[in-house]
A protein has these predicted regions:
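A near-ubiquitous, low-amplitude feature marking generic local secondary-structure context
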Residues: 15, 28-31, 38, 52-56, ...
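Iron-sulfur-associated redox domains of electron-transfer enzymes in respiratory
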Residues: 61-224
Length: 224
């Protein structure tokens, strides 16, 4: 499908400054791929999804998990819960003709329940936990630094975005002790759901399926 418009290359190199995509080979054999024709998983790709967003012909697409989700929803032995990112309830309405930014929280929850999800959660809850963890971590680092421990790395940077963490790992490997050690809200919710919440509800962990509806493709990479 690729028409060699090179929009993916431009957004990857000039906007995101990742540099994972470029033109390789020559003439009729030219293609857009990572350097040395490496697999995308072996490249500097951060899975931010911007190349997919700007591709005008659908030559680049994300991995689709719809069939897997439908199988879980149809399985009576599974308890399927879903978490939605705050951005989703603000952006979803535009797809249905509502003014940009219109909140559709109630409609979204109703629709998800009608689709077959057993429980619907807001990732805001897990985001609060992440903020508490990051706050405790920065207080700990500052306390140690003020007590004379000069090995403490400051400032502390958030680890909420998997694309950002991936970018940092590839481009600043000598500073990996600067980002927070806290999990992202998505991952923190998954841990809480499969331990504390599952125990409280009396649901066996192996029967629980946690689904995330997120605005960023990097969340798929993070789950894998």
């Amino acid at each position: 499908k690729c028409i060699f418009c090179r929009r993916c290359e431009s957004v990857c190199n000039d906007v995101q400054t990742v540099g994972a995509l470029g033109a390789i080979r020559r003439g009729f054999n030219t293609t857009i791929a990572p350097a040395f024709d490496k697999m995308m998983t072996d490249s500097e790709c951060t899975y931010c999804g911007q190349c997919v967003a700007v591709c005008p012909v659908g030559a680049l697409t994300e991995r689709d998990h719809t069939n897997r989700l439908l199988e879980d929803l149809a399985n009576p032995d599974k308890v399927v819960i879903v978490q939605t990112a705050p951005a989703v309830r603000a952006a979803l309405g535009e797809e249905f003709g509502l003014p940009p930014g219109t909140l559709v929280t109630g409609k979204m929850v109703y629709a998800l329940r009608e689709l077959g999800f057993d429980y619907v959660f807001d990732t805001d809850f897990a985001a609060d936990l992440t903020i508490m963890e990051e706050g405790a971590e920065i207080l700990n680092r500052l306390t140690r630094y003020l007590q004379g421990d000069k090995s403490v790395r400051l400032p502390i940077l958030t680890s909420c975005c998997p694309a950002w963490v991936n970018f940092f790992e590839h481009h600043f490997p000598d500073m990996l002790d600067i980002p927070s050690t806290a999990r992202s809200p998505q991952q923190m919710f998954g841990s809480i759901a499969k331990t504390f919440w599952a125990k409280k509800m009396g649901i066996p962990r192996e029967k629980l399926v946690v689904v995330s509806i997120m605005p960023c493709l990097a969340k798929k990479y993070e789950c894998d």
